[in-house]
């Protein structure tokens, strides 16, 4: 019986030694981790992300479109030359998470255009009927696999998020097709950074 108790104490003693070494190893590894990695870990403040497929997009002026086609992987639009239009995405929006009101960190778009003569000119963000962010004259064309628009004020969400795209189609003899894949938003609980005066 005494030998068994001695063996148990030894095992406990050995475990305590090893756990102490493990703690020291963890402290050493933490100290050797680059500061950039620590900053990146602290910067993760997205508590909810929501995306909607491009096939859900609405066209404000359908008569200004030469053709449109819903395909499994995107919504294909061909604009009439020399005209502008507005396309709208309604993002599924949680306004509260664990009794805390969410804030908008950034909105994102995924789309392509077939030429520089078909472009996204403006990006407007709405919470219900209130316009909360304006990114005018961005003129995006070509491959935009992940275009981000950060809202530095991080406004609270109350009524539902909408992203409206002002688009344009030039008059050049170029392809005026656009392919909208998806649109989304990152939500946070963090308030905006204080502005130094």
Regions found by a protein language model. Give the residues of each.
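N-terminal secretory signal peptides
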Residues: 1-14, 25-28, 35-37
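C-terminal segment of N-terminal export signals and the immediately downstream linker at the start
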Residues: 30-57
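Short beta-strands within extracellular/lumenal beta-sheet-rich domains
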Residues: 78-100
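A short beta-strand element within beta-rich, extracytoplasmic domains
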Residues: 100-114
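Short, surface-exposed beta-strand/strand-loop-strand elements in extracellular ectodomains
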Residues: 117-129
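Extracellular carbohydrate recognition and processing domains
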Residues: 132-154
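Noncatalytic modules at the cell exterior or secretory-pathway interfaces
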Residues: 153-174
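Exposed low-complexity, polar/acidic, P/S/T/G-rich flexible segments that act as propeptides
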Residues: 168-197
């Amino acid at each position: 019986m005494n030998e068994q108790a001695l063996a148990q104490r030894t095992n406990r003693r050995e475990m305590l030694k090893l756990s102490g070494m493990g703690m020291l190893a963890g402290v050493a590894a933490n100290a050797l981790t680059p500061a950039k990695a620590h900053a990146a870990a602290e910067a993760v403040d997205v508590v909810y992300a929501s995306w909607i497929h491009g096939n859900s997009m609405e066209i404000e002026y359908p008569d200004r479109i030469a053709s449109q086609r819903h395909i499994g992987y995107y919504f294909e639009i061909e604009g009439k030359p020399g005209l502008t239009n507005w396309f709208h995405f309604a993002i599924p929006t949680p306004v509260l998470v664990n009794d805390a009101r969410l804030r908008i960190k950034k909105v994102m778009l995924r789309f392509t255009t077939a030429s520089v003569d078909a472009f996204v000119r403006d990006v407007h963000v709405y919470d219900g009927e209130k316009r909360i962010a304006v990114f005018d004259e961005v003129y995006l064309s070509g491959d935009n696999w992940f275009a981000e628009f950060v809202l530095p004020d991080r406004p609270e969400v109350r009524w539902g998020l909408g992203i409206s795209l002002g688009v344009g189609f030039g008059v050049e003899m170029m392809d005026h097709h656009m392919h909208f894949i998806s649109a989304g938003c990152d939500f946070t609980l963090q308030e905006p950074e204080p502005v130094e005066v």
